[in-house]
Amino acid sequence: TLKVGTTGQQRIEYKSQFFLAYDKIDTRRDASFLSAYHKETNKLQGTIFKKIMGHFNQTTNQYVWDADAVLYRLAGVYLMMAEVENMQGGDVAKYINFVRERAYGKAWDKAKYGYENADFTTNELAILHEKDKEMLGEGQRWWDVLRMTLTKGGKPLVFCTEGSVDGTPILNEATEAYKVLWPIETEMLNKDPKLEQTPGYVK
C-alpha cells in the first residue's frame, strides 16, 4: 500500500481506460499507479496515482515526500524530436522506441512492442499516447493537445475525439474555443481600466 496514513491528499485521478492502455509489462504502469480490484470479480475498480510521491521510511514509520522535481527529461527530448520529425515528414519510430525500450526493460521486444513509422495522423497520436504514459503527472498534456494536430497544420487535438481518453473532445470547439487562452484575473482588471478581459470570459 501507499502507507501515507492521514498525510497528503489524492488530488489527481485518472480514468480506468488510461490505466488499461498500458501493457502489463510496461514498468511505467505500476511505477505510476496502485490499482484496486474487486475482491470477487477481480475487475478494476480504480487507481491511485503514486508517481513522484517519495518513499516510506520503515525506521521512522513515516512517509518522506522527497521525490525529485521533474524539470527536463531525456525521454521528453526524444518525444519532442519525434514531433519535429513528424512535421518534417520523417521517421518518428526511433524516438518513440528509445522511450519504450527503457520502459519495457528486459522484456523489450522490438518486433512485438516497437512502433513502426506511419502517416502523419497515426504518428502524431502515437507520440501523444507515448507522452501520456511517460510524462504522466508532469503537467504537459494540456500543452500537448493544444500544440499537436490531427492533420498537418490542421485542428488541434484539444478539439478532437482522438485527443481524449474516452472519445469525448476535451473542449467543444463551437462553445469552448476561448478556453485555449487564459482569462485575466479580476484584481488586475480592477487596477488597470485599459485592460480588456480575454474574449469569452466574464468581465
Q: Can you annotate each of these PLM segments?
A:
Residues 23-203:
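Acidic/polar-rich alpha-helix caps and helix-coil junctions
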Residues 1-12, 18:
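Polar, glycine-rich mid-to-C-terminal structural blocks
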